[in-house]
Each structure stands twice: as C-alpha cells, then as structure tokens.
Amino acid sequence: MPKRTDIQKIMVIGSGPIIIGQAAEFDYAGTQACLSLKEEGYEVVLVNSNPATIMTDKEIADKVYIEPITLEFVTRILRKEGPDALLPTLGGQTGLNMAMELSKNGILDELGVELLGTKLSAIDQAEDRDLFKQLMEELEQPIPESEIVNTVEEAVAFAATIGYPVIVRPAFTLGGTGGGMCANEKELREITENGLKLSPVTQCLIERSIAGFKEIEYEVMRDSADNALVVCNMENFDPVGIHTGDSIVFAPAQTMSDYENQMLRDASLSIIRALKIEGGCNVQLALDPNSFKYYVIEVNPRVSRSSALASKATGYPIAKLAAKIAVGLTLDEVINPVTGSTYAMFEPALDYVVAKIPRFPFDKFEKGERRLGTQMKATGEVMAIGRNIEESLLKACRSLEIGVHHNEIPELAAVSDDTLIEKVVKAQDDRLFYVSEAIRRGYTPEEIAELTKIDIFYLDKLLHIFEIEQELGAHPQDLEVLKTAKLNGFSDRKIAELWGTTDDKVRQLRLENKIVPVYKMVDTCAAEFDSETPYFYSTYGWENESIKSDKESVLVLGSGPIRIGQGVEFDYATVHSVKAIQAAGYEAIIMNSNPETVSTDFSVSDKLYFEPLTFEDVMNVIDLEQPKGVIVQFGGQTAINLAEPLAKAGVTILGTQVADLDRAEDRDLFEQALKELDIPQPPGQTATNEEEAALAARKIGFPVLVRPSYVLGGRAMEIVENEEDLRSYMRTAVKASPDHPVLVDSYIVGQECEVDAISDGKNVLIPGIMEHIERAGVHSGDSMAVYPPQTLSQKVQETIADYTKRLAIGLHCLGMMNIQFVIKDEKVYVIEVNPRASRTVPFLSKVTNIPMAQVATKLILGQSLSELGYQNGLYPESTRVHIKAPVFSFTKLAKVDSLLGPEMKSTGEVMGSDATLEKALYKAFEASYLHLPTFGNVVFTIADDAKEEALNLARRFQNIGYGILATEGTAAFFASHGLQAQPVGKIGDDDKDIPSFVRKGRIQAIINTVGTKRTADEDGEQIRRSAIEHGVPLFTALDTANAMLKVLESRSFVTEAI
C-alpha cells in the first residue's frame, strides 16, 4: 500500500528528559523517525522538552518546540499547528501517556487529529493489566496467574491464595517503577502501597513469581497489510526476576532449541497481530528451562530500549521503518537501507554474537540499594560484538568504564566464601564479577546454575575464560596461547598481568607476529547479500572487511555509556563534530560503545567502529585507518583520559594539546597558569594525606570544599565545616596518594555561573554566560541555569568575558572550553576550567543558534572564527529568557539521598523558554515534573544557618495563600519573628510527623535544608524519601524554592479587604 496522501502534517511527541528507564534510545528513535517522515515529504512538528538531544535540533523537523510535555502545552501546540495526525510511539512511556491523556480529555476528537502507529485500544490493551490479561486469554497465550488490585488488602488476600513469592507490577509506569518481588506479606504491603501511589490509575497487578525461568525478548514489526516479522530475539543472561534493562543480554538468543524458538516466535507474531500494531513492538516471554512451558510477561506497543539494542545489534533501523509504516507504507515496499538492495520484509540474520551490559550509577551513589529486581536502576548500557560469547562479553566488560578490563574485579579475591555465595545468589549490579570469582575458586558451573538459575551454557563460557587465564599463566610469551586468548576477547592488559609484563610489550609481540584484529561488517544478512553499510566490529580471524579509503580521515572518540555526570549531551557534541568534519571534506570516523545513541547510528558517520573506548581498541583502529588525527574534546572524560596515552604512542591529537589539557586538570600547573594570567581563584592547596589536608584547611580557614583531582560530575566532592569532618572524609571518601592528590579549597558562598567558549588560538567566541539559580555548593549539573544572566552587573559580565579570553589564549585552547566562576561582592573567582565540550553545549547551542560543536570542530581543522563570521568576545544576548533545569531519577534509586550538594545526581535536563524569567521558570518546573498547586501547605525544616532566609520565603508563601507548617526548631524561630507556623513532628511522632502528613496528602511542598556537618541526618533523609515516594515537590536549596515562589507570585492575585 503506498503512503497516505490524506495527511500532510504530523506531530511527533518526544520522550522528554532522560531518566532511568528512558534514556538516549528515544533520542535515537525520534531523530530517525522525524527524518524518515521528512524524507517521505510530510511536514513534521516535534514537541520535546529535552534540549540535550539531536532530536530537538532545528534541522530534524520542520518545526521544533522545546516545551513541557504536559496536557496544557501540548494542547496549545496542537491548536496552533493543527496537524492531521499524531505519532506518539517514539516518545517512550512519556509519549504514550501523553497520547492517552489527550484522547481522554477529548482534545484529539475536538481537533480531528488521528493517532498513527498504535491505536489507543492497543496501547490500552498492552498497558492496562486487566485488558492485557483478557486479550492473552482470548489468544490462548499463557500468562502467570494474577489479579488486578486497587487496595493493599486485596493484594494480601490474593497472595494468600497463590502463595509467595509474588511480583507487583503497577499499571502505566515506566521501567518497573514502584514494582518489585515480595517474599512475604510485610514486603507485599510495603511495595503495593507504593505501587498504587505511583500508578496514574491506582492499579497494580499481583502475579505469581516465575523467577528462575529464562527471559527471552522478541523485537517484532508489523505493517497495515498484516505483514509481520521478527527483527531479532534476545536472551537475558539473568533469569526472570531482574528487569531486562538491568540484565546482561545476548543477541541472538543462545540456548533455545529450534522448537522453542519457533514456539515463542509464533506467540510474539500472534500478539502483535492481535493488537493490530503498525510499527515496532517488543514482547517479553519467560521460558521454563525444564519443559516447553512458557509465559508471556509483557508487551511494549512502542519503540523501546530493546528496539534500540536490536537496531544496533542487527543494523535493521526499526524506528526509521516504524515511521514509514505509520504513514501506510508496507514492509515489502520499503528498501532495507543497510543492504540497499533487499526489502525490509527480510528478517535479519546474524553471524556474530552481541552482548549488552548495563551501566549502573552506584559509583556515584555508594549508599544506593544495589539489589536488582523488577525496578530498573541502570542509567545506560554498553554493547559489544564478537564472533563468540567470550569475545563479546569481555569486550563489553572493558567498555563499561568502571575500572575493569576483564570479567574480574581484583578486590573480590579477598571476599569470604560465605559473602561470595550470598552475592552470587542475591543479584546486585556486579553479580557477573562475583560469579566469575566463584568459578575461579573452583565452584562448578552445575553448582552455580543450581544457585542462580543462570543457564549452564553461559557458566561454561565463564569457565572457558578461566581456563584460558590458566593457560596464559602457565605459558608466558607463547604465541599459540596468545592467539587463543585474543580470539576469546582477552585484552592486552589482562594478558600482560598474567605474564608479569607490560601492555606495551604484549602489543609489540602481537604486532611483530601479525596477531592483529580484522574488522567485520554488520550487514543484517550474514553476508548473503552485498551490503553497503560502513558499520564494523573487530575480531581475531581472517579477511578484513574494512577497507581504508583514499580520502583523509578524522577519528572522533565518543563518550561511551550514559552515566550520571556524562550523559547524552556529549553524544550531541560528537554528532555535530562529525557533521563539521564531513563539511570540511574529510572522512569522519566514529568509535563508540553505546547502543542507545545517535552517534552509533551507522548513517551518521562515514564509518562506525562499535568498539570499547580503551587505548588498545582505539590504537587498533588507528593502525588500520591512519587518520589525520583524533578529536577527543567531545567525548567527555572518557575521551580526554585517552589523550595522553594516544599522544605518547605518536598519535596526533587535534585541538587543545595534551600538555595544555594537563595545565587545566593538574592543580599545581593550573594555579601557576592563573597566577601568570593574573586571574583570582579561591585560595586552596593540594594534599596527599590526612595530615597535609588538615594543615591546609587550618591555613585557608573553614568551610572548605574537598575533592579528588581529575573527576567528572563531582564524584566524592564535599563541603566540610570542621577538622573532625575533614579527617573523616580523608579516611573514608577518597584514596589520596601522591599520584592522586586531594584538593582543599576555601568554600566561597556566592553566585555561581559558567561559560562555554570556543577559541581558534587567537580569538575567543563566548556564546553566552549562564547564571546558576542555586548558590555555589550545588554541582553545576544539578543547578538551574539561566541565560542570559538576570542578576549579574555589567561590570561582572565584562570581567567574566575578559577572564575567559585570557584563559582560552593562555591555556592554548583550540576548540571548546568550559569555565565555572563564583562571584562574591562583585569579585569574580575562577573555580574550574574544563578544556573540552561540557554538558551545557546543546542547551547553549539551541538558545544562541550557534552550532558550537560544529564551530569548534572547524577551528580544530584549521579555520578561524573570523572566516566563519564570528566576532571576538561575548555574543549578543537573546531577548527571551531560557532556563535549563535538572531532572532526577530518585524514585528508581532506593536509599539514595535526594539532598543536593557538590556531587552530581541528576540524570537529565529540560528547558523552559519565554519572554520573562517567571514564565520561563514555570515552564522549566512543569517540564521537570515539579508541579505546585496554587494552594495548600508548605512545610519548612531548616538548618540554623538558613532560618533567617527561610523566614522571608515563608512570609511570601503565606501572602499568596499557602498554609505554613514547620518542625519544632524552625517553628519556634518563625514565631519569635511574628510568623505563626503549625508545628509538625519530625520522624516517629506517629501520625503527626511529616511522612504521615505527606501520606495523607496534607503537604504540597517540602523545603528542607541541612547544615554542612557530616553527621548522619537520618530524620532528614526519611523526610526527603517520603517526598520522593509520594511525588511531593522537594526543595533542598532555598534558591530553588525562591525561584518557584517567583512563579507562584506571578500567577497569583492578592485578595485584600479595603
């Protein structure tokens, strides 16, 4: 069926900010879909609140609205644009829920907007637990015994009839939010209560647990002519019971018989046909390893995290084709862009194995609950491709960037057998490493399979890896064993460890004996047809399929898996850099390991290498491609950390040179540079042990800010008030050493702001200054940023511009740099300089209309700012006000404290833009799901040093009609200043404490600040947790509360008697 001509204008809803469970895979899907629809000649209108994505670039759609994805704003845009149709299936759960809401409120009917892709009835049938159950019964598809409940008591009664363990699944939530496995009634009560609150329809499904079955996923596609096919099946290494987003996954599935595959394939295709989905869909099934019994777990009627993985694993572009199907094209009419010759109706065939390993944020959240279950906790993932399981698994391990280069964490060797077995059974984020350690200690695959229900097939592979380790240890320098190890994915570093030599010597031995990798093409058809995709992975075998072209090339290093502190913003910069390299006439080569992102879409670059970002893997590509140079400044800390070893190996680093990178990162060199340039910084010193730190702090005076050097995202940074706290920090938080000193700085409480600058070595372009709403002390990634600045004097802005120019030229910066300043009493201090692209690049690029990463890349390749038409200095300001606001994923991370400080905690961001500060703030708060009703109660629980300031806020809240509640000390302080607040108990005061008020819905916002002492603030933590669990707006910085007040004041009227 040809494409539809009765519709011209289509609105696409994006997925909003990145949160755990909904990450960069939707930027990739949305970008593909918008371009795919434009290619077919439709006018595309995009709504998405996330500025950090490629998807919200002007070129991606005909009209791009970076506005909140809420009923209020989406309705406005629908009325203004009057599209014929709406495509919501590429915006994750956010897009689907928005479509449901628009429909339920009658907006789609009123405006005559048709829904494309998936009908509302199908969304309902897949998402509403009751309707899903009915449909499965009609199709005679087995599902676990279950019951829908709306109260905790109903849940307890049902569990009594089927027995524990049971699983709780709230309806219409994302990434298993609020769900979990319950072994007894106490856990069931707790999880169901929370699940009912988080479900928008107050509904949970209680089902019999089938934990221990194999978890299999099928990624399927269907068109309007009822053609349907399986793109790819995938098998979880971890059995059912751990969220698939937190599981290690292999594609294609490895342990199913032909009969089992056929059985589950038929089930998946019959489900997508029954739901009449036009586009992509993901079906999750549980297979009993001991019989042919299976259950359908769930269906996602949309593009998902698994579809991004399936697209990258097979090369089959699911989102692109889903968009074409949505407008009426059929699979037998669309050419598969990978082969360029076969139709999309051919099912992909793979002649390799793909491994995906999730990346968790527990390096930032040491207190977080690491036990894995049905609620997702990973922030990102890595993928690796190999010719066997061992190779793809080990390549994926070293892609994770958690300080491992093999499937082992050396520290685990010291763990007792009891602890080891407990960690093997009770899965945490690092279970793979504990299982591998158990094998090294002689536990058999059979014993481990019995304990974990992991298929023995995979455990045999781990045993095989261990056997190769022993072989290597027994035969140093043996070329045959070396070849075997390389065929199975071993890194040079691991081999060097086992041989007691250096990585360099192993590399030399390999090169001398021509033991080098070949690169194979990902072609969707197991080499049956000719393919034209420049998409490669390395393996040790024969026949290299990646041919170096005659054109001069430039290699760009990506930023690896998404984690807190290094998010999709860096992928954004990478993609823009590639565009500029191509525009300059070079061949652009990308190397990255993240399957969720736009940069690993093979149509973005001239060549894509899907490889770990380690020195060895990067050098292998450089040896083959011989590029003009490597660009490291867009790949975050990942790429910057590779600059030095690459330069030592003789590779040309394009842009700022290694010595200058060092001057910005190394504390003593940086201080020296600032002295020479006559730029003030807060007084500070470096310390390599506890005594030195105490001495430095006494000299500088408390409070001090302490942190390790060379980190991204403020890891292990703290503000300490006294010597006792400082000593405790030095003992527990960091491993200080002469190689890794700790920085001790005077902590200046002032206004913070940051600048991104682009330099060609002579001139410096400053696109804009961003002013932070929160004072210094909250990590810049967690602060709300305002552009253009609203409170900085002209003099301060000129000083900032002057210091920025001096720094860029003085540090010989070529390309991008980011500088953070703090201002106190009109004096400007430099806090830090990052000689690379920062996380504010996408936001600032969008609000100033300067494609910053592209400009920087052109300068790196030799053009000048004046040639590109840019002036030296600060770029003219925008007339509108733009705000970048952080978004957090605390609901997903139990035991993580939501208090903001110098260590970054946000996972994503949104943008609000309007004519005034108040309106822009309103949009930013709405987009980040911080919605405050216009009346109700605000509770204050404030540390002594901030009570004065809080009093003023409380008065303003009272003036616009809010009730004020406060904890004992705060209430007494307010009363002594003539403001009566209703006192509330802190914690444990039965039904008079804050958490019970929150549960009863009597509190609309919580304002809670903490002193800077390092004492455990358990009460405060419980109060903050109760706010997170019940979705009550929580402010841990008075500046943010003040910003919210500005919004409320601008929207409220004062009513007074005359």
UniProtKB/Swiss-Prot annotation:
PROSITE patterns: ATP_GRASP (PS50975), CPSASE_1 (PS00866), CPSASE_2 (PS00867), MGS (PS51855). GO terms for biological process: 'de novo' UMP biosynthetic process; glutamine metabolic process; L-arginine biosynthetic process. Pfam families: CPSase_L_D2 (PF02786), CPSase_L_D3 (PF02787), MGS (PF02142). Pathway: Amino-acid biosynthesis; L-arginine biosynthesis; carbamoyl phosphate from bicarbonate: step 1/1; Pyrimidine metabolism; UMP biosynthesis via de novo pathway; (S)-dihydroorotate from bicarbonate: step 1/3. It is an enzyme of class 6 (ligase). It comes from the Bacteria. This is Carbamoyl phosphate synthase large chain. ATP 1 binds at R129, R169, G175, G176, R208, I210, E215, G241, I242, H243, Q284, E298. ATP 2 binds at R707, S746, I748, E752, G777, V778, H779, S780, Q820, E832. Residues 930-1058 are annotated as: Allosteric domain. NCBIfam families: CPSaseII_lrg (TIGR01369), PRK05294.1 (NF003671), PRK12815.1 (NF009455). Composed of two chains; the small (or glutamine) chain promotes the hydrolysis of glutamine to ammonia, which is used by the large (or ammonia) chain to synthesize carbamoyl phosphate. Tetramer of heterodimers (alpha,beta)4. Residues 402-546 are annotated as: Oligomerization domain. It comes from Streptococcus pneumoniae (strain CGSP14). Residues 547-929 are annotated as: Carbamoyl phosphate synthetic domain. Keywords: Amino-acid biosynthesis, Arginine biosynthesis, ATP-binding, Ligase, Magnesium, Manganese, Metal-binding, Nucleotide-binding, Pyrimidine biosynthesis, Repeat. GO terms for cellular component: cytoplasm. Binds 4 Mg(2+) or Mn(2+) ions per subunit. Mg(2+) 2 binds at E298, N300. It catalyses: hydrogencarbonate + L-glutamine + 2 ATP + H2O = carbamoyl phosphate + L-glutamate + 2 ADP + phosphate + 2 H(+). Its cofactor is Mg(2+); Mn(2+).
